[in-house]
């Protein structure tokens, strides 16, 4: 069954929405982390909101925030099973559809 989550989304310039998003299933070497804390940096997110982010992969719609602390709740087929339940720091992620 697909997992849903709530996320802040910037769908277009100068617009912020709270949306329900579908969480991607972990690929074989990936893990799924339930976020407890995430940071929003004033510089990066301001550029995203203003539509001035130079990185080509960051196109609208975008979910801001890329540093997360949370607990591993699911592991992919080739990911170490001992990671389940571990608290981790994530410095970037592939998360939402």
Located regions from the model:
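Residue-level signal for short segments within beta-strands and strand-turn junctions
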Residues: 9-11, 50, 72
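Cytochrome P450 core scaffold surrounding the K-helix E-X-X-R motif
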Residues: 42-50
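Glycine-rich beta-strand-centered segment in the early N-terminal region that forms part
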Residues: 23-40, 52-96
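Short structural boundary motif marking the start of a folded domain
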Residues: 2-7
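Short glycine/threonine/proline-enriched tight-turn/helix- or strand-capping micro-motif at secondary-structure
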Residues: 14-22
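Residue-level recognition of beta-strand termini and adjacent short loop/turns
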Residues: 12-14, 27
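Intrinsically disordered, low-complexity, positively charged segments
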Residues: 16, 40-41
